[in-house]
Amino acid sequence: MSVSFPRQSARTQRFTLGAPRSFRVADDGSRVVYLRTRGGEDPVGCLWVLDLAAAEPREHCVADPRDLRADDSQLPPEERARRERSRESAGGIVAFATDDGATVAAFAVGGQLFVADLVAGGARALAVSGPVIDPRPSPDGERVAFVRDGAVLVAGIDGSGERRLAGDDDPELTWGLAEFIAAEEMDRLRGYWWSPDSRQLAVARVDTRPVQRWHIGDPADPSTVPTAMAYPAAGTPNADVSLFVVGLDGHSVEVAWDRSALPYLAEVVWSAPGPLTLVVQSRNQRERVVLAANLDSADGTDTGAARAVNRVTDERWVDLVPGVPCWLPDGQLVDTADEQDTRQLTVDGRPITPAGLQVRAAVSVTSEGIIFTASQDDPAAIAVWRVGVGGEELQRLTAPDEVAAAAGDADTLVTVTRRFDQPGAVTEVRHRLGTFPVRSLAATPAITTRAQLLRLGQRRLRAVLCLPSDHREGDGPLPVLLDPYGGPHAQRAVASHDALLTSQWFADQGFAVLVADGRGTPGRGPAWERSVAGDLATAPLADQVDALTACADAHPGLLNLERVAIRGWSFGGYLAALAVLRRPDVFAAAIAGAPVTDMALYDTHYTERYLGMPDEQPQAYAANSLLNDAASLRRPLLLIHGLADDNVVAAHTLRLSRALLEAGRPHTVLPLSGVTHMTPQEEVAENLLLLQLRFLQDSLRVDITAPGQGAGGGAVASNRM
């Protein structure tokens, strides 16, 4: 019996189960460590090793939580928060850390600490008290550090000699954990770092007492006590974050910098070529400074004073780029700079990548060169590149029409590539002995995309058009569904087959589905990204309308512009609701999932980057709010929101619904009890797609026959109301 796409997508967690991920390459290139479940519908992550030192390279599983009798059904609250911030929906082993040689790995399952032998194989539980969060072996593999109850502890790699290194008795003062803003907006999911010599740790101390408390409850279970969380909404105080260096001997020193001027601790790097290095930002994010901490003063004392080694400013904002800063073995600093409308790699301030090559992330740095990812002529594609430290020998290592990521270095490089015309991903290890595949056990999607990459309108907007699988030339006109994200820091119009599967499923129900990336999206240069400064509404919405109009002009008779809907989640949900409120002449219906309706309710780091402080820019916040447009609603609007969402809290949807009710505007609200900003539950994920389809059919007055019957796979206009 065949399984429908909505059910298959839900069971496979959007086809991520069974795919290898989270790669770590041993310093000597002898092995690659990674996570993978045992099948495309198996949600339990296992730890695997590809042994490249064997006569015949082979992979083997070194830790399966089921064999270890590990139970992750009851996660510690801190671990639940970490998984929500990283959008992690799998179970079992979802994260691990290794020593420098990748001989041992540490991980936690259900708060229990395990250590795996990556050479001989096998894993064992350590007899330390829990719950354990974020365990990390020392670089020499002799010890393991971890967080428990907001304190940092260390033990021998066998679990012996457990002792606390840093902590407070106040639950609002935590050590070794990333605060909400760092994890949600800066992609910093950790709060402590081993020194290269394994004798010290740099530990973040987070004081959440200044932060307002919000409460996330479950209205479906009135006996449940709401959970209090420190949520820094725009214009309100952030957590106070500081950094200490703590020795195994108990000695500690605070790293000193001007935290009033540069309060955001965005990243910490502590690797052998360089000093303890911090990346800090001003509150308005127009200044980003790389600091080096002084831990070896002339008189033998550790002052902890930090000096600036690179400072970047911008009148709009300065972006954080993954993988930088880092240090070359000779002490030169690798960073990025925005010059000639290009994000370029720099070495001690000198650009080493050319104009037009938009750097996405640095992967690794050696004296021989730098591995990085970048987009060249097309933001829909990302390739892996290598460049010499002086800018010589620039070389693209993956195809120009793929979406690629990488781990490791030039000697042992893991590449993961996705193609527009091929489901899944291809993972390979490029080693001096040859190229070796890493198996994917992910399920094959039940549908295949019928899509074309487009450039639309005067701005050459990158877009994808998905048509019904059985569409024939001359069929139409088809009802249209716009399916964007459309905002900063994310793309949907990419050269990846699986990124478009849900859009294709809607197309197979009889729609022409258009996915367009407008101004503010990454990959097209700093000016393009910063064109939404001060206004997140006008340009993104105008670009969706322009993409629709240009697509219709390019395909006469294909699109029914009288029946156009739009759907989206998060910023895409905001954009969808915005579309029917401000352009009802274009959009006949909208589905807004987890929409940000009032920018003053969203977090500091994201919102203030684009709109400034609410008390300084009240007009910007008012102009970008959906609440003020409630009386303009004339079209069907479906609002969907998880009531347990702690990122875009349900108050966004509830406040818009209240404003619509007060204005006498009919609308539909679908509350999801127990659901966060993700929708990982199988039944919820499946039925949510089906309910959205029915809403579109009803709102656009479209009848859907069986697939393969009727124009374009079954969508025909109806006169019924």
Locate predicted features.
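Beta-propeller folds
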Residues: 1-396, 401-404, 711-721
